[in-house]
């Protein structure tokens, strides 16, 4: 269970770095906003899901 927690936490950290770069780029390009909007929503949902999964696994591991 500890290895699963570490893998999910690592995925959250890497995905957070990707979102830190991707979100400002998507907001800075107004001509591609219609194409970027669904990706931002999906990325935000994945990030929230990873945060909740880390919280649940943290409760189970510790």
UniProtKB/Swiss-Prot annotation:
Keywords: Membrane, Photosynthesis, Photosystem II, Reaction center, Thylakoid, Transmembrane, Transmembrane helix
TM annotation in the entry: 8-28, 41-61
Bilayer topology: Multi-pass membrane protein
The keyword Cell wall biogenesis/degradation appears for this protein: no
Compartment annotation: Cellular thylakoid membrane
Entry's Gene Ontology cellular component terms: photosystem II reaction center; plasma membrane-derived thylakoid membrane
InterPro entries: PSII_PsbZ, PSII_PsbZ_sf
Keyword Thylakoid tagged: yes
Top-rank lineage group of the source organism: Bacteria
Chief location: membrane
GO term, biological process aspect, one: photosystem II stabilization
Family of this protein: Belongs to the PsbZ family.
Function: May control the interaction of photosystem II (PSII) cores with the light-harvesting antenna, regulates electron flow through the 2 photosystem reaction centers. PSII is a light-driven water plastoquinone oxidoreductase, using light energy to abstract electrons from H(2)O, generating a proton gradient subsequently used for ATP formation.
Subunit structure of this chain's protein: PSII is composed of 1 copy each of membrane proteins PsbA, PsbB, PsbC, PsbD, PsbE, PsbF, PsbH, PsbI, PsbJ, PsbK, PsbL, PsbM, PsbT, PsbX, PsbY, PsbZ, Psb30/Ycf12, peripheral proteins PsbO, CyanoQ (PsbQ), PsbU, PsbV and a large number of cofactors. It forms dimeric complexes.
Protein name per UniProt: Photosystem II reaction center protein Z
